[in-house]
Amino acid sequence: MFDTHCHLRFPDYEPLGGATKVLDRATEAGVRGAITIATTVEDARRSADLAESDDRLWHTAGVHPLYSDDSGALDELKAIAERPKCVAFGEMGLDQHYAKPNQDIQIASLEGQLERISRWRKDGLAKPIVIHCRKATADLIPRLNDSGLPADQFVFHCFTGTPDEARAVLDFGAWISFTGVVTFQNAPEVARAASLVPNDRIMAETDAPFMTPAPHRNIKPNEPKFVVHVCEALAKIRGCTPQAMEELLDTNAERFFGITLPDSPRAF
């Protein structure tokens, strides 16, 4: 297994021994690696340092919409994205669940990042893009489309929308990634959405320290080791074995992010 999206620099992990100990527990569970996702420019810089210290870890470079009022140094993302363990830009996008930062600030941050990514791509710095979308599908997809960037280079992480919203993302041409929400009994629409995604455009993640999956929902913080439960849930929803689901998810992660996972024991 592989956790395509977590936040190992968050202070939640300090009482647990830090990122290395968290990754050790993931390895014991058959999770072969993870991507620690940036939320600010400084977080991206420190995430790069962390990833370069552990063969099981990669990182991204981007500004989260809920931190978009701190977007004054977007040009600095280029140097971070050029570092050897950076596999994507992001996470970036729109979040309409919270009132702050307001939508104008979020949009300015998103469009500023997309404009730079498009320009850097023409200069040879081409990486996929991790998208945060919360209650904003109808507003976000047109902005991504207007960027001119290839639709298949976007992944909508932590999908919590409806089947119709999943179809909109798929019609646009992007990928969809699922968290422990697919294990929640009170989220049947997310499970139905997960059944719709083609084999070649689905991924799994924890979004740790958030979204701990069943049967461990009361455990905080969430950890990359629990991505195995996301895999099991997706296998059940999609009518295949956990082994087949793990192989598919690992292959997709390697293909989308351009990485080779460590040759270590699998979860299933």
Language model features with spans:
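Mid-domain alpha/beta scaffold segments of enzyme catalytic cores
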Residues: 1-268
